[in-house]
Amino acid sequence: MLIYARFAALILTALTLGLSFAHVLEMPAKLAYAPDVYLALQTSLYVSFGSPNVGAFVEPAAILAVVSLGYLVRRRRRALWLTMGSAVCLLLAFPVVFFIFTEPANAFFRVAHLTSLPADFEPYRRQWEYSHAARFVLHAAGFALLALSVLIRPRAAHSELSPFTGGAIQTQRERSYSSPSPSPY
């Protein structure tokens, strides 16, 4: 069960990261476009990113998968902290940054028309682009924390890696027999 939950969380978070990375890669060119070209792109290119298409469901599914994974690893302290850190990053990206910064710009672009471009177009364009850049940073941090939570191994009780046994785990009892006791002199 745990391996499937980890796989789902990684895939969904990677897809979310990919969607936000696409926006960041496009940002330099889009900021240079004329307002009419930019508005045409906004109203045609990003239709599949939003509701009712698949893009709108990937990010909430990633958040649910990561939070569910946190529940499954709740007894593994390091994995739990990393997984919950990932969840916090994803929850900051959506809904916090999205609804405070991105959605107001989306609402502006939904009502703006090419024939009557509003005078306050540029601040909304920058708000939309930079909010997606912020979301990308949060998604990247969330994915990195999630990957670390999957890659770390639980610590064995009272053990450490021994350079003398080829890196095999040595228990505290084995260490006391194999290492010389310090001289009292």
Annotate each PLM feature.
Residues 33-37, 76, 103, 112-113, ...:
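Membrane-interface elements of multi-pass transporters and channels
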Residues 17-27, 67-74, 98-102, 147-157:
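Transmembrane helix-loop junctions and nearby membrane-interface residues
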Residues 110-165:
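A generic hydrophobic-segment detector
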Residues 85-109, 169-185:
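Hydrophobic alpha-helical transmembrane segments of integral membrane proteins
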Residues 58-69, 138-143:
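Core segments of transmembrane alpha-helices
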Residues 1-16, 68-93:
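Interfacial segments of alpha-helical transmembrane regions
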Residues 69-88, 153-173, 177:
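Cytoplasmic juxtamembrane regions at transmembrane-helix boundaries
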Residues 2-64, 107-126, 161-164:
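Interfacial loop at the N-terminal end of multi-pass membrane proteins
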